[in-house]
């Protein structure tokens, strides 16, 4: 009787160890798969509750106003004029993660537009901000673009300064027009694009 009980306990211990090892291996493999995939492929807000044509990522151009102003442009290779940039919404510069793999170590809500834009809602029953761009770079890094070399561009003057590397951006676009605070729902677009600046009055930026 004692031998049978000991054998039974030993078999249960082996079974538990086997289940634990299998679960750990499965989680490790899942993490490895995630690290090999672009983050935006796992982003639910890019494809849900959108009208036809919305939520599809394209290689669009983007014009930004340097003095805390920004207006995303969604058609491919489009550029805003200075007047259009001047009438757009504010832009926030935020610290950058060290690598794309670092995103997986944090809650995905860190880059979700609905989470980030919630901090901008101050009063109820106001029109939701239509579009907004977050640049996840140190402000001094953005300013340093003006210390680079001049290149041709489509902004006013035809000459711009190009960033030495693509900048990390989160583009937020209102999912449906006519929404009012606090019920604002945004689509999230995560990308990296090079920034071009005129640097004349530091009011124009373009990213491609």
UniProtKB/Swiss-Prot annotation:
Q: How is it modified after translation?
A: The N-terminus is blocked. Glycosylated.
Query: Where expressed (tissues)?
Result: Male-specific expression in proximal caput of the epididymis (at protein level).
Top-level taxon in the UniProt lineage: Eukaryota
Outline what the protein does.
Answer: Secreted proximal epididymal protein required for post-testicular sperm maturation and male fertility. May be involved in sperm adhesion to the egg zona pellucida. Does not have ribonuclease activity.
The record's Gene Ontology biological-process terms are: epithelial cell morphogenesis; heterotypic cell-cell adhesion; male gonad development; positive regulation of cell-cell adhesion; positive regulation of flagellated sperm motility; regulation of fertilization; seminiferous tubule development; single fertilization
* PANTHER family xrefs: INACTIVE RIBONUCLEASE-LIKE PROTEIN 10, RIBONUCLEASE
Q: Where in the cell is it found?
A: Secreted
Q: What happens when the gene is disrupted?
A: Mice are viable, anatomically normal and reach adulthood but display impaired fertility consequent to an inability of the spermatozoa to ascend the uterotubal junction (UTJ) canal of the female reproductive tract and gain the site of fertilization. Spermatozoa fail to establish a strong association with either epididymal epithelial cells, the zona pellucida of oocytes or oviductal epithelial cells, yet they are capable of fertilizing eggs in vitro.
- CDD domains attached here? RNase_A
Tell me the protein family, please.
Belongs to the pancreatic ribonuclease family.
- What GO CC terms are in its UniProt record? extracellular region
* This protein's name: Inactive ribonuclease-like protein 10
Q: Which UniProt keywords apply?
A: Cell adhesion, Fertilization, Glycoprotein, Secreted, Signal
């Amino acid at each position: 009787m004692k031998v049978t009980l000991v054998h039974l306990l030993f078999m249960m211990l082996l079974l538990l160890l086997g289940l634990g090892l299998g679960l750990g291996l499965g989680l490790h493999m899942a993490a490895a798969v995630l690290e090999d995939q672009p983050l935006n492929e796992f982003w639910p807000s890019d494809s849900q509750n959108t009208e036809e044509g919305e939520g599809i990522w394209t290689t669009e151009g983007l014009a930004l106003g340097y003095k805390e102003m920004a207006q995303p442009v969604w058609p491919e290779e489009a550029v805003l004029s200075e007047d259009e940039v001047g009438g757009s919404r504010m832009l926030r510069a935020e610290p950058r993660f060290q690598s794309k793999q670092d995103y997986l170590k944090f809650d995905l809500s860190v880059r979700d537009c609905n989470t980030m834009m919630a901090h901008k809602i101050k009063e109820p029953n106001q029109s939701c901000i239509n579009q907004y761009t977050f640049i996840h770079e140190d402000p001094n890094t953005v300013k340093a673009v003006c210390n680079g070399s001049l290149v041709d561009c489509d902004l006013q003057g035809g000459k711009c300064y190009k960033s030495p590397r693509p900048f990390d951006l989160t583009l937020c676009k209102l999912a449906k027009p006519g929404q009012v605070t606090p019920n604002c729902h945004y689509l999230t677009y995560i990308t990296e694009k090079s920034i071009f600046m005129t640097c004349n009055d530091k009011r124009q930026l373009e990213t491609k």
